[in-house]
Amino acid sequence: MRVKTGVVRRRRHKKVLKLARGFYSGRRKHFRKAKEQLERSMYYAFRDRKQKKRDFRSLWVVRINAACRMHNTSYSRFMHALKVANIELDRKVLADMAMNDMQAFTSVLESVKEHL
């Protein structure tokens, strides 16, 4: 018995075209182009979710380093002193302190001064 793909194909096409909303021109309207663009888009999304973590970590390092240099020390010395002093503040929190609460950051820096 012959099986037609009418319903299955329509569902698949609808699913792809629904996900392709917001794309430009034929990449939104034509199934094949939409499917190709969607594949690429999903690849970019997957890759950049990993990249985002690296980008934010490097941003935090830059911010902490800038705050440390205002107090005549370097990022690497400061992080080593934190480890030696057994203070477990992560880079995200330290960068936030450096940006929004310099007084708190300075107090942390003063508390590890003896380990520098």
Curated annotation (Swiss-Prot):
GO terms for molecular function: rRNA binding; structural constituent of ribosome. It holds the Pfam family Ribosomal_L20. GO terms for biological process: ribosomal large subunit assembly; translation. CDD domains: Ribosomal_L20 (cd07026). The keyword Heme does not apply. Signal peptide: none annotated. The keyword ATP-binding does not apply. Keywords: Ribonucleoprotein, Ribosomal protein, RNA-binding, rRNA-binding. One of its GO terms (cellular component) is ribosome. Belongs to the bacterial ribosomal protein bL20 family. Binds directly to 23S ribosomal RNA and is necessary for the in vitro assembly process of the 50S ribosomal subunit. It is not involved in the protein synthesizing functions of that subunit. This is Large ribosomal subunit protein bL20. It comes from Helicobacter pylori (strain G27).
